[in-house]
Amino acid sequence: MVLLWGTFLLVCTRYLVPISVRYIMSDLRDGNLVEKSKRLVWARFNQYTAGEMRLLETYLSRINPRDPESSRVQFTLAEYKELLGRPEIDVRNVKPQLDHFLGNVVTIEGIKNGAPAWDMYTLFTRATCLYDEDLRQYVISINCNPELRSVFFNLAEDGYIRYRLRYTKNMKSQYSIKLYGMLRDWLHHGAYTVPIERLREELGATEKSYCAFKPFRVRVLDPAVSEINAISDLK
């Protein structure tokens, strides 16, 4: 980890990350492939919990990113609880959590008319919970926002990263999941310098308690780097 006048120098290689229809799976398969557009990699997820980020990762692993008709994905209630890390959730109290998930706003930045611009969206606009007689259990289906189909299904134009679900599904921190995607995108850039303030914003660590560098490093960066090194293919 190198601190240079308020910026981080991130060095990324494949093995070194120094920083001082319906679709139901019978299980959460770690080997599934995640293909994530770069617009989604760099979107700002300020309101997402770690469990909701894991849910998004699994959603991405279950769609066909070249077929918008695959945008409806189902999870068994057991899968949903496992991804969120909320074993107490059942069909009687799942609605408030779904309200929060659907209401999360994501900021996507870009360039329009030659100047920086941004849009704010909810990624998902519909959720359904019903009892499946064939499976003999409740299932939850979610659909992405139709206005954002290009973010999920237009990979060739936007560019994308790809990796196995197992590298993020078991991460306990939303910052780890977000940073992993950023590092994946930076792999071929070698050294990359990022202002501290921008890094905070990109990770969604915008609470006042993280304004000072030390708590940001101790509570956000160091745990995220440790988890990435321990779980993912970036060592």
Q: Language model features by range: what are they?
A:
Residues 3-235:
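Charged, alpha-helix-forming regions
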